[in-house]
């Protein structure tokens, strides 16, 4: 729904969208007296009748709580819909709840069609043979082995896939709540559970969210020269209270696996996440505990402890030691983004100590995607007992309204090994193609794996994508300006007509105010700040429109709404700041005030008095 659709009726009464019922009633009574057809001459009666009907319709909708609720959410089109909520005996609050439920159901259906079904496909490819120089071959006479150069065709024929993994999931809502937060969606998998943890978020608080749901997660993975390993998980998510959410997952195929996880927010700064994984009765369960606390405004410290595979006496002593105990500390630093209420990641650092793996890692968010530059760039480095020193770079950009394409490059130091990954995602679907490029330093591999793709991306961005993006932005801006100009012309004609209708009645009211020494508007001008005398289109005389607001020697203009929403004032065609100047007399003393476009005021005020 266009936002303007749920705004026009408020503009008809000259009110902000958060106007109270008393303000709606007061504005209606004042405007109905101004534009009542019986108070105008015969040549103005038709125009007054049209304006009066608009005001009458606006008041009928906005003064009715149920109609107002529908209009605020669906606009005029919603008023034409039979909502089936007019049951006798229903209170205004019950009607609001009924409408809210219908709105929430509609939103859930829209979200379900977009993100409830998710899938992820990963295919690992080994392309290191592309840069193999020689190959060892057996002598045909059986006199030993020699080497020879590989042909390009032979190199390409040696490229092969290493492994693939396909994972998909979908959710079925089982119950809803208007008060609970939405539990974060983290699918269980048969692999690592490190990504199952996330801090509780308050951004969805107060919205209608699923308080419990059932998720089905299927996964199939296979390595070269090995059997396919399928798995199916059923995961039940519930949120019994705003501070607590829990999940329990069951493996429906052998080997049996049960996973239990909870997220508990102790307060607004501290959370704890315990996770237990049970894989049969022959070994003790594995556990992971995460404790996090917000230390600074944008900084959070997280501690994670994993038991790994362990034994208690003879219980579990025969189990393979695939994942041993570890402890890690992570600091996550966010940063504020202009014109955004949600902070974004700036950098994070992690230190891990364990029996099988120990290391440090640091990631820095170099650039966030913006409207002018849709690229997001991240840099990272890590050093561990398993992979040595690794340096990585990741860049991604939107290639459509819902699609994102990204490239990740990782370089091993000092071996010079290169691995890069191509990633594509659209809504809940994701495809990853990790490519093993070279295992040792090779100039050809570095050129084709680093220099060529980076320069190609920069060249395409600089000489093709960026000019095209700027051209589209310019074209869209011109279209918006033309649309605004057409709308401004229509509103200008309507405002001039309204001033003509009000002028005679307002002048009579001002004459009465003058006779009793009340509030008299001498002059009012709505203009662009610092506009020159040779720019008549950037200012307008609004004396009649402001004087029409005077009631019983008082004038009130609400805040947070543009002055162009006042009856008889049309928008000025400019992106610059606007202001309203009012010169008035009260008790035969002159006053003057200059207001910003969305600044409220109550007249008269001693602060506005002009000192002689």
From Swiss-Prot:
Q: Name one GO cellular component term.
A: MIB complex
Q: Which cysteines are joined by disulfide bonds?
A: none
Query: Where exactly are the transmembrane stretches of this chain?
Result: 445-465
Q: What Pfam families does this protein's entry cite? A: DnaJ, DnaJ-like_C11_C, DNAJC11_beta-barrel
Instruction: Indicate what this protein is called per its UniProt record.
Output: Uncharacterized J domain-containing protein C63.03
InterPro entries recorded for this chain? DnaJ-like_C11_C (IPR024586), DnaJ_domain (IPR001623), DnaJ_domain_CS (IPR018253), DNAJC11-like_beta-barrel (IPR055225), J_dom_sf (IPR036869), Mito_inner_membrane_organizer (IPR052243)
UniProt keywords (A-Z) are: Chaperone, Membrane, Transmembrane, Transmembrane helix
SUPFAM superfamilies per UniProt: Chaperone J-domain
Can you tell me which family this protein belongs to? Answer: Belongs to the DnaJ family.
Q: Name one GO biological process term.
A: cristae formation
**Does the record bear Chaperone in its keywords?**
yes
Question: What high-level taxonomic lineage is stated for the organism?
Answer: Eukaryota, Fungi, Dikarya, Ascomycota, Taphrinomycotina
What is the native source organism of this protein?
Answer: Schizosaccharomyces pombe (strain 972 / ATCC 24843) (Fission yeast)
């Amino acid at each position: 729904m266009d936002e303007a659709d749920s705004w026009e009726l408020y503009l008809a009464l000259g009110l902000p969208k958060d106007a109270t019922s008393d303000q709606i009633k007061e504005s209606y009574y004042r405007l109905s007296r101004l534009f009542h057809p019986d108070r105008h001459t015969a040549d103005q009666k038709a125009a007054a009748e049209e304006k009066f009907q608009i005001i009458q319709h606006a008041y009928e909708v906005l003064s009715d709580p149920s109609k107002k609720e529908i209009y605020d959410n669906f606009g005029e089109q919603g008023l034409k819909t039979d909502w089936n909520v007019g049951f006798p005996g229903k209170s205004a609050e019950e009607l609001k709840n009924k409408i809210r439920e219908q709105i929430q159901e509609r939103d859930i259906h829209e979200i379900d069609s977009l993100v409830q079904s998710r899938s992820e496909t990963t295919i690992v490819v080994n392309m290191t043979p592309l840069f193999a120089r020689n190959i060892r071959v057996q002598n045909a006479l059986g006199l030993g082995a020699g080497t020879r150069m590989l042909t390009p065709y032979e190199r390409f024929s040696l490229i092969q896939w290493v492994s693939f993994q396909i994972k998909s999931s979908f959710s079925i809502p089982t119950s809803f709540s208007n008060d609970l937060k939405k539990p974060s969606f983290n699918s269980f998998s048969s692999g690592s559970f490190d990504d199952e943890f996330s801090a509780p978020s308050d951004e969805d608080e107060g919205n209608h969210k699923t308080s419990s749901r059932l998720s089905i997660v299927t996964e199939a993975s296979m390595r070269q020269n090995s059997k396919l390993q399928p798995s199916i998980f059923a995961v039940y998510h519930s949120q019994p209270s705003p501070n607590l959410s829990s999940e329990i997952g069951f493996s429906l195929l052998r080997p049996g696996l049960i996973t239990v996880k909870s997220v508990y927010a102790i307060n607004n700064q501290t959370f704890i996440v315990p996770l237990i994984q049970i894989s049969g009765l022959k070994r003790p369960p594995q556990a992971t505990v995460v404790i996090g606390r917000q230390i600074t405004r944008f900084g959070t410290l997280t501690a994670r402890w994993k038991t790994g595979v362990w034994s208690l006496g003879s219980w579990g002593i025969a189990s393979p030691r695939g994942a041993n105990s570890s402890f890690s500390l992570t600091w996550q630093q966010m940063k504020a983004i202009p014109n955004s209420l949600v902070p974004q990641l700036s950098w994070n650092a992690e230190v891990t100590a364990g029996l099988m793996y120990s290391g440090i890692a640091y990631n820095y968010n170099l650039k966030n995607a913006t409207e002018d530059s849709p690229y997001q760039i991240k840099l990272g480095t890590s050093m561990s007992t398993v992979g040595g020193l690794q340096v990585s770079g990741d860049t991604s950009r939107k290639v459509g309204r819902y699609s994102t394409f990204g490239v990740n490059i990782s370089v091993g130091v000092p071996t010079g090994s290169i691995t890069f990954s191509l990633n594509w995602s659209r809504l809940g679907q994701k495809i990853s193609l990790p490519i093993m490029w070279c295992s040792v330093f090779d100039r050809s591999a570095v050129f084709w794996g680093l220099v060529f793709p980076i320069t190609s991306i920069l060249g395409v961005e600089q000489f093709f994508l960026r000019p095209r993006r700027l051209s589209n932005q310019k074209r869209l801006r011109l279209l918006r300006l033309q649309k605004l100009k057409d709308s401004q012309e229509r509103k200008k004609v309507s405002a001039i007509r309204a001033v003509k209708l009000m002028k005679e009645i307002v002048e009579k009211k001002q004459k009465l105010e003058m006779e009793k020494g009340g509030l008299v508007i001498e002059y009012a001008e709505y203009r662009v700040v610092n506009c020159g005398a040779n720019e008549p289109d950037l200012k307008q005389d609004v004396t009649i429109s402001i004087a029409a607001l005077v009631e019983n020697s008082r004038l009130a203009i609400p805040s947070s709404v543009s002055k162009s929403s006042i009856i008889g004032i049309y928008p000025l065609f400019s992106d610059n700041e606007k202001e309203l100047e009012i010169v008035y007399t009260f008790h035969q003393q002159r006053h003057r005030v200059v207001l910003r476009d969305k600044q409220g005021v109550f007249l008269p005020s001693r602060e506005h008095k002009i000192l002689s």
